C-alpha cells in the first residue's frame, strides 16, 4: 500500500521552487532600496498591488454573504506582518542573519502547537528543531555566548518568523474548527 499522495513528486517540486524563490526575495528588496525606495516603502510597494487585486474579491464575498468572519483576516494580518518583517529585515541586517532567524520558524510553530493546539511533536520534529537551533548557534553564538540577535534587523527577522508561525498555527486551528462544524451539520 502506497500512502503517498498521487501528486507527491509534483507537490515536492513546487515546494522546492517556491522555497528557492522565497529565499531570493531579498534581491528585489535591495534593488528597490538602491533605486531610492528606502526602508519599509519597498515592502509596501511589493504588497499594495496584491492587496488591491484581492480587495474586490473580499467585498464580493461579503456582499454574497460568504464571509468567514474575522478568522481569515486575522490569519492574513499575521502572515502579512511576518512577510513585512522578513522583507524589512534584509534592509537592516546581513542577508544570512535574516534568513537564519526567519527560518527558525519551525521552533515557534512547534511551541505554539504545543501550547495552543495541545499537539506533542513527533521525533522527526525534534531533529528539525535541533538542526534549526544548531544553525542559529553556529552563526550567532561563535564567542561561546548565548546566541542573541545583535541589531534591529535581526530582531525583526525573528519577529517575522514568529508571526508566520502564529498564522500557520491559527490557520490549522481555524481549519480544524470549520471542518468539525461541517461534519456536525451533516
Q: Model-flagged regions — what are they?
A:
Residues 1-41, 85, 130, 147-172:
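Glycine-/small-residue-enriched transmembrane alpha-helix faces in small-molecule transporters
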Residues 68-76, 121-132, 154, 179-180:
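Cytoplasmic-side transmembrane-helix entry/capping segments in multi-pass membrane proteins
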Residues 54, 79, 124-142:
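Hydrophobic transmembrane alpha-helices of multi-pass small-molecule transport proteins
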Residues 24-25, 61-97, 138:
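Specific transmembrane alpha-helical segments of multi-pass solute transporters/efflux pumps
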Residues 54-58, 86, 113, 136-140, ...:
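Structural signal for membrane-spanning alpha-helices in multi-pass inner-membrane proteins
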Residues 53, 58-61, 105-130:
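C-terminal transmembrane-helix exit sites in multi-pass transporters
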Residues 178-186:
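Single conserved hydrophobic/aromatic residue that forms the stacking wall/gate
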Amino acid at each position: 500500500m502506497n500512502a503517498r499522495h498521487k501528486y507527491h513528486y509534483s507537490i515536492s517540486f513546487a515546494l522546492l521552487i517556491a522555497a528557492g524563490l522565497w529565499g531570493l526575495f531579498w534581491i528585489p528588496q535591495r534593488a528597490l532600496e538602491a533605486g531610492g525606495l528606502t526602508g519599509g516603502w519597498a515592502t509596501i510597494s511589493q504588497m499594495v498591488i496584491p492587496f488591491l487585486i484581492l480587495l474586490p474579491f473580499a467585498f464580493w464575498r461579503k456582499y454574497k454573504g460568504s464571509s468567514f468572519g474575522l478568522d481569515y483576516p486575522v490569519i492574513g494580518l499575521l502572515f502579512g506582518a511576518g512577510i513585512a518583517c522578513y522583507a524589512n529585515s534584509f534592509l537592516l541586517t546581513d542577508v544570512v542573519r535574516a534568513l537564519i532567524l526567519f527560518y527558525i520558524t519551525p521552533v515557534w510553530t512547534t511551541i505554539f502547537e504545543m501550547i495552543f493546539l495541545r499537539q506533542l511533536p513527533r521525533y522527526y520534529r525534534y531533529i528539525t528543531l535541533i538542526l534549526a537551533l544548531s544553525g542559529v548557534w553556529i552563526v550567532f553564538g561563535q564567542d561561546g555566548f548565548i546566541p542573541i540577535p545583535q541589531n534591529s534587523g535581526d530582531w525583526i527577522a525573528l519577529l517575522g518568523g514568529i508571526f508566520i508561525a502564529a498564522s500557520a498555527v491559527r490557520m490549522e486551528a481555524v481549519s480544524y474548527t470549520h471542518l468539525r462544524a461541517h461534519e456536525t451539520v451533516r
